[in-house]
Swiss-Prot record:
The keyword Phosphoprotein applies. Transmembrane segments: none annotated. The modification Phosphoserine is found at residue 146. This is Tumor suppressor candidate gene 1 protein homolog. InterPro entries: CCDC89-like. It comes from the Eukaryota. Residues 24-33, 196-205 have a biased composition (Basic and acidic residues). It comes from Mus musculus (Mouse). Residues 1-12 have a biased composition (Low complexity). Residues 1-49, 113-149, 174-205 are annotated as: Disordered. Residues 13-23, 34-48 have a biased composition (Gly residues). Keywords: Coiled coil, Phosphoprotein. The keyword Transmembrane does not apply. Residues 66-110 form a coiled coil. The lineage of its organism: Eukaryota, Metazoa, Chordata, Craniata, Vertebrata.
């Protein structure tokens, strides 16, 4: 009897120890799972992280969109300013062209206008003595650019040219010894015309 009870007691104690070890191992496993679950990020945590990431991404996109809008507005303002500057320069160019054409017309009308002014002065002063008007006209004719002065200059050059041709012809023929013929100096009259030799024909105009 005592042997059977002792064996049962031993079996019971062994079984109790085995059961206790299995219970402790189960509790340790659950504790590990619980600790792991508490230390990690669950599906709720992952969903919250994704939402924050989306919010940051949306904020970045909104900032980029606002920057693009500001750049477009600045570009539009610059284009408007350039268009205004272009219109102003176009008007300035037209004004300068008109002034240039006006100055060119004035330059073309200058001789005629001066003649008209002189005619107007002569008509406004009919009582002026004839000698003064004649002297004034003679003075205009004696100007370097007047037709009378140009004609006198042309005649003088023609005389010099003919004398040079005659001298060259005589030297080529050998009929003229050196220093035999002296060229008479050109003499100018009071009116500015040169005195022609009687043997040299007058130039035709």
């Amino acid at each position: 009897m005592w042997r059977m009870r002792g064996g049962a007691t031993r079996r019971g104690s062994c079984g109790g120890e085995g059961g206790g070890s299995r219970g402790e191992s189960g509790r340790l496993g659950r504790a590990r799972e619980g600790g792991g679950g508490g230390g990690g990020v669950g599906w709720r945590g992952r969903a919250g992280g994704a939402r924050r990431q989306l919010e940051e991404r949306f904020a970045d996109l909104a900032a980029s969109h606002l920057e693009a809008l500001r750049a477009r507005d600045e570009r539009d303002r610059q284009n408007a300013r350039l268009r205004e500057e272009n219109a102003r320069l176009r008007l300035e160019n037209r004004r300068l062209r008109r002034e240039n054409r006006s100055l060119f017309r004035q330059a073309l009308r200058l001789p005629g206008d001066s003649g008209e002014r002189e005619a107007a002065v002569e008509t406004l002063a009919p009582d002026e003595p004839a000698t003064n008007r004649k002297a004034r006209g003679h003075g205009r004719e004696e100007e370097p650019g007047s037709p009378r002065a140009l004609r006198a200059r042309l005649e003088k050059l023609e005389v010099m040219y003919r004398r040079a041709l005659l001298q060259l012809h005589l030297e080529q023929q050998g009929a003229r010894p050196p220093g035999a013929i002296e060229e008479p100096p050109l003499q100018e009259t009071a009116t500015g015309l040169c005195a022609h030799d009687p043997d040299v024909p007058r130039p035709w105009l």
